[in-house]
Design a protein with these regions (language model features):
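Acidic/polar active-site rim loop that often engages polyanionic ligands
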Residues: 12-24, 116-117, 181
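Short acidic-hydrophobic sequence patches enriched in Asp/Glu that either
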Residues: 5, 27-34, 176, 180, ...
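Conserved nucleotide- and phosphate/pyrophosphate-binding catalytic cores
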Residues: 142-343
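Short, compositionally biased low-complexity segments
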Residues: 7-13, 76, 199-203
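Short connector loops/turns at beta-strand edges and beta->alpha or beta->beta junctions
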Residues: 7-11, 110, 177
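N-terminal catalytic cores of NTP/NDP-binding nucleotidyl/phosphoryl-transfer enzymes
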Residues: 1-15, 122-129
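Flexible loop/turn segments at secondary-structure boundaries
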Residues: 10-13, 61-62, 130, 156-159, ...
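Divalent-metal (Mg2+/Mn2+/Ca2+)-assisted nucleotide/phosphate chemistry catalytic cores
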Residues: 23, 27-28, 34-152, 160
């Protein structure tokens, strides 16, 4: 039985793994709200009848600090913790005592999952290796049991060299209130050429040979299929079809006649039904000198502030008319709005 754990407690600290600077500290109320939202989102993909959902706040919220130091902290060597990559890369820029404790907290999570549910295997991204190993050692010391860990390669954006992640910038959300279905579709449609085949292997159920053939035949058609399949997985085939048609109505279709063979349901969509009515719109009077792009994004409701928009641009997640905007100082002018509109 899979065990799905959300970090209602550890989310109050933030994992320093892979980070060059400290995370923004969220309030307890925000973390609790986020944890519940994540649980609900995950339940769309993993039935709560066939999995164990747990929040680590259950065992951390009532734990006494002195008890934790004595019973758990005594099992860890600071010398060994300092050899972890997540710690070493932060020593020069500064690592708070708060973040330094994260490894111990995650290790204790593994111990509690093993104790309460018999968990024998922890899975995570490759940047979690040190934390997972710490957990296996803690379980062995406290319970005299052998447990295991397995890590998987991180998803790396080829153009930025950064991992896909909500704290990095340019991330998308499963919640359509945070990322609209159309924006979710466009995120995948705008995948870098070098990443398309890899992401199709990860996020579609299409046969491997078919994926290779599609990518060889037309990288843009491959992007459409990737976007459609990923959107169908997160939001439903019906929503994916609407996003595909809306994008095609604005930018055109890469294979309108379905000449490239594919088993994807995208081939069954009638592209003659393409309309752009479903697109969220924002109208403005463009100044003669143009408008600073982060300001435009904020005013259009795409970001909460100019600063958030700048971070999104720097993270590689901002596009204008299917072209990535990489300069946070970019100014959009009349030429960027052919026929008086843009996406």
């Amino acid at each position: 039985v899979p065990i799905v754990m959300v970090g209602g407690a550890t989310g109050q600290i933030g994992d320093p793994s892979g980070k060059s600077e400290a995370r923004v500290i969220l309030s307890k109320e925000v973390v609790a709200h986020n944890a519940e939202c994540i649980r609900k989102q995950l339940s769309r993909f993993i039935s709560e009848d066939n999995a164990i959902f747990v929040n680590n706040a259950e065992w951390f919220n009532n734990m006494l600090y002195l008890d934790f130091l004595r019973d758990i902290g005594s099992k860890f060597s600071v010398n060994k913790m300092l050899t972890a990559e997540s710690v070493k890369m932060r020593l020069e820029t500064g690592l708070s005592f708060l973040e330094f404790n994260y490894m111990i907290l995650q290790a204790y999570d593994f111990y509690m999952l093993n104790k309460k549910f018999g968990c024998k295997l922890e899975m995570g991204g490759q940047d979690q290796w040190g934390n997972i190993v710490a957990g296996t050692e803690l379980v062995r010391r406290l319970s005299q049991q052998e447990v295991h860990g397995i890590t998987m390669p991180l998803l790396i954006n080829s153009s930025t060299g950064q991992k896909f992640g909500k704290s990095v910038g340019g991330a998308v959300w499963l919640d359509k209130n945070k990322t609209s279905v159309f924006d979710y579709y466009q995120f995948w449609r705008n995948t870098d050429d070098a990443d398309v085949q890899k992401l199709m292997l990860y996020f579609t159920a299409l046969p491997v040979d078919e994926i290779r053939n599609i990518c060889s035949a037309s990288i843009n058609r491959a992007k459409e299929i990737l976007a459609f399949e990923a959107t169908a997985l997160a939001h439903s085939g019906e929503e994916a079809a609407k996003a595909y048609l809306a994008a095609g109505a604005k930018f055109g279709f890469s294979d309108k006649e379905n000449k490239i063979p594919t088993s994807s349901a995208i081939a069954k969509i009638n592209t003659d039904e393409a309309v752009i009515d479903d697109l969220p719109t924002y109208e403005l009077t463009l100044p003669a000198e143009g408008i600073w792009f982060p300001k435009l994004m904020a005013e259009a409701g795409l970001c909460k502030s100019n600063g958030e928009a700048r971070r999104l641009i720097q993270g590689g997640g901002a596009y204008l008319n299917d072209q990535r905007i990489s300069d946070p100082d970019f100014t959009a002018k009349a030429a960027d709005f052919p026929n008086g509109s843009a996406i």
